[in-house]
């Protein structure tokens, strides 16, 4: 059974991100566009809470139900919410195209109802040596966010 979800990002940057998963064992396809980012890499994560009442701050930390250290999307030991970076060309629109095998739209660890956050700085993927590398990837301020909601198929 296919599950689809969508996230409308608001804040200093704006965008729409779509999620699609064919079944519980398939990767999640993440596609969309974010507008207003400065040229360069920007951390892109699923955060624990679907609470944006205090802007992106109330979304909490990265979604990490297993208590792992922060890492790259290709790492087996990482937060479930660690989706790495999106790259802005500086022309306004940044395309999002990710296929991820760890996040899911099914079951107790579903990302539906949680928040996507776009950060100001590059995610160092847990390898930067900064005191925040193993928790946030030292990705900086939260520029925009939105709650991931289920879609009609």
UniProtKB/Swiss-Prot annotation:
It is found in: Cytoplasm. Disulfide bonds join 56-145. Zn(2+) binds at residues 62, 70, 79, 82. It catalyses: 2 superoxide + 2 H(+) = H2O2 + O2. Keywords: Antioxidant, Copper, Cytoplasm, Disulfide bond, Metal-binding, Oxidoreductase, Zinc. The keyword Heme does not apply. Homodimer. This is Superoxide dismutase [Cu-Zn]. The gene is Sod1.
């Amino acid at each position: 059974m296919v599950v689809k979800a969508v996230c409308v990002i608001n804040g200093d940057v704006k965008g729409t991100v779509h999620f699609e998963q064919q079944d519980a064992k398939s990767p999640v396809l993440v596609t969309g566009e974010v507008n207003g980012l400065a040229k360069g890499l920007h951390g892109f994560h699923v955060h624990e809470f679907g609470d944006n009442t205090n802007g992106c701050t109330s979304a909490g930390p990265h979604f990490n139900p297993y208590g792992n250290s922060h890492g790259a999307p290709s790492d087996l030991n990482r937060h479930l919410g660690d989706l790495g970076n999106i790259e802005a060309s500086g022309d306004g629109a940044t395309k999002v195209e990710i296929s991820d095998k760890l996040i899911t739209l099914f079951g107790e660890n579903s990302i539906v109802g949680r928040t996507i956050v776009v950060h100001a700085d590059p995610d160092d993927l847990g390898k930067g040596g900064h005191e925040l590398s193993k928790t946030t990837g030292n990705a900086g301020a939260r520029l925009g966010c939105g709650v991931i909601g289920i879609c009609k198929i």
